[in-house]
Amino acid sequence: MARKNKDGVKYIALKKADLERRFKEYNEMYFDGVLPPCNIRIVKSTNRIAAWYNFRSKVPKIYMARNVYWTEDDLKSVFIHEMVHHYVWKILKYDSFFSHVRTFRKVCRMLRKKHGLRVNLWEYPLSHWKGEKKPSFLKDMTVRFLYWILPL
């Protein structure tokens, strides 16, 4: 469902059913239907990460921040980015502490060549966070680092 933010930009209110539909659609369209199921969670991000993939649980999870004004293009790009993580982890069986390594980039290049998709390696430059000021760079990077080294 499209709404407009205070700047008049159309955005999408995240719904789990819509994200699950997108997962199935993008899986068929871009990954030839090979991705196994993945839990999708809509959460409030407190560290300015718009989305992330958690491979540490039995059934991996994709988390999407609800406190973002998601445009259609941003949502598609970021969601497919997280699906690439799922592909690398579950299909290619690549197990690494570092998430945006050569294998990840190789899959992104394949998607660009085959489908014309541009998947950014790092957080998509989202400018529409809902009523929050941006934390300092040091705080932001510290939170990201701790997320990777601490067990969940």
Language-model region placement:
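Metalloprotease/metallohydrolase-associated module, dominated by Zn2+-dependent proteases
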Residues: 2-73, 90-152
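Active-site recognition of the HExxH zinc-binding catalytic motif
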Residues: 77-90
